[in-house]
Regions:
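Flexible phosphate/Mg2+-sensing switch loops adjacent to catalytic phosphate-binding sites
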Residues: 48-71, 267, 299-312, 338, ...
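Conserved P-loop NTP-binding catalytic core
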Residues: 40-96
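Switch/communication elements of ASCE P-loop NTPase nucleotide-binding domains
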Residues: 1-48, 230-421, 663-675, 679-683
Length: 683
């Protein structure tokens, strides 16, 4: 059995929402204030804590703010009930096969002292005694200081562990066995010394005697209060927790919970709800935590009972902000939470006042978008933005990635990309997709020092954008991922794709010039180039070769004009991406931008020959003739030559060195398509 779906109506930030969960592990991801903790709390309210003691209760403040309804509802749908579970949860069954069940919680605040109403199967149906207790939860909050939670004076965790290992004995018997001795010589000496003075003080009235020792009626909880965990690297004597870091203390705390879950078979299903398990952990430990949680869930289902007894199954739900954790699981297990602005119902709009947070945000956004406006226009824009905020309200939308229209190949491609790059692809409202690392490195520098240099608000917006180099031109899976609308929401608020035009670049692999390739090999090995002298004779040779190349270019131009497809590869891709965005209903959130040639050629065409020549020769100090020969050409011939010499250039190194020269203030002109892409992101 597992929780397949949780439905929320009018609960906190949710209007009408369904959250689909996976059988063993589901990861809630998304922005701050997106509603992840609200969903976790909904599960906590619907189910009973494993320890029996509730920490949260239904309150009037759980009802959606400014809602016209005075109530909320939480419904959990469960699937794949075993035979024994079908019998125990028969009153909650929702189909004739008895393999599905549901529990619901209604709460209304329209009367004083209102209490939640629990139903099973369908609204109004009271669950049989003990039926609801078969589904429990364990809540692990964000651990900011696990050392304090495990420290002396807070016996909760240690007491729970001791209780689960009683193995038939009682807490009183264990306390008796753990009782501390009071017969030590030092204690007796203290008794004698104190008793001598006490006798002198009390013998004239009523003589007293004293004894120093531990409480004779010491309970197990008192002993647990004095027990302390110690921790250290393997092979080193454990030390007090105060000498350990927060991260490993968090893992120790999590391990104590796992022991408790392993030992308990008092429920058919236990939901392990974990918030921000990445707290205080470096990436490798975050991966270990996620693997541990997944293994715990799998282990709980590895040996189901064959006698119809309680199954003790475990289902894990994790809420996180960590790109590392979201990248280490298959995307089908991810549920994205997103906060969107929705209109106020008509019945409320006339009397609703602007929510302070929305009004403030509207003013800030209006100001950021009006840097060049006059004072009068700016004031009018702020007023309009504030009035718009009065008619809007924040609402949580969820996007289960398992519902995205991706085939298996596309899903695996996205999983592999996220696993390798740990990109914050799922956390950014604005996303810029580019072909390779060179564009991803250069665009922020170009925006900062040129395109958005005079627009600080736009620059801040651009710098918060997620830059995604996909190392290719197959953008379609990422466009589907980011623009598909589920529950009236999509991952990306703004998506820009920048792709090369690739005119004059053969789609098939170019034949390498053997001499040039040998020069590259020699250069990498520190050996001299092919024997060509760098003198005036070489210059004459270069001029002759350039003249011949120009003649060939002219002849080839006439032929290509008749035979080449007038639509260049970049334009074909742009049309495909625009059509895809339109089919997904996200064209208003999308912009595809292409050039005519490749990145390097476009940089040259924009007038950056000198700065690019310096960078290229820094990387290839023996290739001056090759560079001059290529740049001396024009049009498609130059594009082919530039493409050819850059095929043996390390793109990342090239972009890094060019970025440094731009930062140092060397003359640089921004290619039009790069400027358009930067502006499109912040528009």
């Amino acid at each position: 059995m597992y929780l397949r779906k949780i439905k929320l109506a009018n609960f906190r930030s949710f209007q009408e929402t369904e959250i689909e969960l996976q059988k063993d592990l589901t990861v809630f991801v998304g922005e701050n204030n997106g509603g992840k903790s609200n969903a976790i709390d909904a599960i906590r309210l619907l189910t009973i804590p494993l320890g029996g003691r509730r920490e949260i209760y239904c309150e009037g403040t759980d009802i959606r703010f400014q809602s016209t309804r005075p109530d909320f509802e939480i419904v959990g749908e469960f699937e794949e009930l075993s035979t024994g579970q079908q019998g125990r949860l028969i009153s909650a069954a929702t189909d004739v096969s008895l393999t599905r069940a549901a529990f619901g919680l209604n709460f209304s605040a329209d009367r004083l002292g209102a209490r939640p109403t629990l139903w099973a199967g369908k609204d109004g149906n009271t669950p049989e005694p003990g039926c609801h207790e078969m589904i429990r939860h364990v809540y692990l909050p964000t651990l900011r200081d696990a050392k304090r939670s495990l420290a002396s004076g807070n016996p909760t965790r240690i007491m729970a562990l001791l209780t689960h290992f009683l193995d038939g004995s009682s807490p009183a018997e264990l306390a008796k066995d753990l009782a501390r001795t009071q017969s030590h010589d030092v204690l007796q000496k203290v008794d004698g010394a104190v008793d001598k003075g006490l006798q002198a003080l009390t013998s004239g009235v009523r003589r007293q005697t004293a004894s120093l020792g531990f409480a004779s009626d010491e309970a197990l909880v008192d002993i647990a209060r004095d027990l302390r965990f110690k921790l250290a690297d393997h092979g080193v004597d454990p030390e007090d927790l105060r000498y350990s870091g927060h991260g490993y203390a968090n893992l120790l705390f999590m391990a104590t919970i796992a022991v408790e879950l392993e030992k308990v078979r008092t429920a058919d299903l236990t939901l392990f709800l974990v918030e921000e398990p990445e707290a205080h952990l470096h990436p490798q430990l975050q991966a270990a935590v996620l693997s541990f949680l997944r293994d715990q869930a799998a282990h709980s289902r590895s040996s189901p009972p064959d006698d119809g007894s309680l199954a003790g199954e475990l289902q894990v739900v994790v809420a996180t902000h960590s790109p590392n954790l979201s990248a280490w699981v298959a995307n089908e297990r991810l549920v994205l939470f997103k906060s969107v602005a929705v209109p106020v119902p008509p019945s409320d709009s006339e009397k609703a006042e602007p929510e302070p947070q929305l009004a403030d945000a509207a003013v800030i956004e209006s100001s950021a978008a009006s840097e060049t406006s006059s004072p009068g226009e700016l004031k009018e824009g702020v007023v309009d933005a504030t009035m718009t905020a009065a008619a809007m309200r924040r609402s949580t939308r969820v996007i289960p990635l398992c519902q995205l229209p991706l085939d298996d190949g596309e899903r695996r491609k996205i999983d592999r990309y996220l696993d390798v790059t740990k990109a914050a692809l799922l956390f950014g409202g604005r996303v810029l997709l580019v072909e390779g690392i060179a564009e991803a490195l250069l665009l922020p520098i170009v925006a900062k020092h040129h395109t958005l240099k005079s627009h600080p608000e736009k620059l801040r917006l651009f710098m918060s954008t997620v830059f995604v180099p996909i190392d290719g031109v197959d953008f379609a899976p990422y466009i589907k991922l980011l623009l598909t609308s589920i529950n009236d929401a999509r991952i990306a608020d703004r998506l820009v794709v920048m792709t090369d035009g690739d005119r004059a670049v053969d789609e098939d692999k170019d034949e390498e010039d053997d001499g040039a390739a040998q020069d590259e090999i020699n250069e990498s090995a520190g050996v001299g180039p092919s024997p060509i002298s760098e003198d005036n004779g070489e210059s004459a040779l270069v001029r002759e070769e350039v003249a011949q190349a120009l003649k060939r270019e002219e002849d080839e131009g006439d032929t290509q004009a008749k035979t080449v497809d007038p639509v260049i590869p970049g334009e074909r891709r742009k049309k495909e991406f625009d059509d895809l965005a339109t089919s997904l209903g996200g064209i208003d959130h999308f912009r595809a931008i292409t050039s005519i040639y490749s990145l390097e050629t476009e940089l040259i065409e924009a007038g950056n020959v000198d700065i690019l020549r310096n960078v290229y020769l820094d990387l290839h100090p023996r290739s001056r003739r090759k560079w001059d020969k290529a740049v001396a050409l024009s049009g498609d011939a130059r594009a082919k030559a530039i493409h050819k010499i850059f095929k043996t250039t390390r793109k990342g190194d090239f972009a890094q060195m060019l970025a440094k020269r731009i930062e140092d203030g060397e003359a640089f002109k921004v290619p039009a398509y790069i400027g358009d892409a930067i502006e499109a992101v912040v528009s």
